[in-house]
Amino acid sequence: MVRRHFPGRAIVKVLTSHGYRLVGREGSHVRLRWDPPDQHDSAVRLVSVPVGHEVGGDTLRNIADQCGADDFDAFCTWIERNR
């Protein structure tokens, strides 16, 4: 079964190690930005991640959507494998 709860800091660590960069902080949330390579047809992605607690449920699903994930379970597996 796929794990669906992760510490916010672990999510930030995985995303920043895969091209996202920290662009701001508001309260307990950090803002990350991914700029696509020139040959990529995707738009810039902005992601907000709460870092003070475990992230799961709809919040984790929203983060996956903001990252452009098509498959939520695959996104969770990717986070688990890279944390």
Q: Where do the model's predicted regions map?
A:
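C-terminal structural segments of small proteins and small subunits
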Residues: E54-R83
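Flexible domain-boundary/linker segments
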Residues: H18, L32, E80-R81
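Short alpha-helical interface elements
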Residues: R3, P36-H40, A74, E80
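Short, surface-exposed loop/turn microsegments at beta-strand edges and helix-strand junctions
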Residues: D41, H53-E54
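N-terminal first-folded block
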Residues: M1-E26
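Major-groove DNA-recognition helix of helix-turn-helix-type DNA-binding domains
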Residues: V23-S42
